[in-house]
Design a protein with these regions (language model features):
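Conserved small-domain helix->loop->beta segment predominantly found in fold-type I
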Residues: 3-73, 77-79, 92-98, 135-137
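Conserved strand-to-helix beginnings and helix N-cap segments that scaffold or border functional pockets
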Residues: 1, 5, 120-121
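PLP-dependent enzyme catalytic core of the Aspartate aminotransferase-like
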Residues: 81-137
């Protein structure tokens, strides 16, 4: 668990500064002060995070398809999984989900025991498949 926490934290920190990433949802990066206050000291942010890309309606399908991770809605394995969470969990409620600010293009990732460098390489390779003009400022 400690290795998964550490890798997830470092991966989220890396992804948070990439030009093609719009939002990272991970406890130690994107949560409010009240949530931060309740975190257990030394407990880590866990191995689960979500990512929304810039221009997600264009970029998420290509990115997800190119991302060389096992695809599935599970979590807690020793290998990293990803899934288009909102589409899987709320497909019949997409209008409602959008009304509360959740992107239908959110990709959820459950980090496993792969090395940080392996995961960064896979995310970077998938990012090469998206339209760079759509996220440049």
């Amino acid at each position: 668990i400690q290795q998964i926490n550490k890798t997830a934290q470092q991966l989220c920190e890396y992804l948070a500064v990439q030009s093609w990433v719009d939002e990272i949802y991970y406890p130690t990066i994107s949560c409010d002060a009240l949530y931060q206050k309740g975190l257990k000291s030394g407990g880590g942010g866990a191995g689960l995070f979500s990512i929304v890309l810039k221009s997600p309606e264009k970029n998420s399908p290509q990115f997800y398809d190119a991302l060389q991770l096992t695809k599935g809605p599970s979590l807690g394995t020793n290998f990293t999984l990803c899934c288009p969470y909102t589409m899987l969990a709320h497909y019949d409620e997409l209008e409602w989900v959008a009304s509360i600010g959740v992107s239908p293009y959110l990709i959820r990732v459950s980090v496993g025991l792969e090395s940080l460098s392996t995961l960064i390489a896979r995310f970077d390779a998938a990012a090469e498949n998206i339209n760079q003009e759509s996220y440049r400022e």
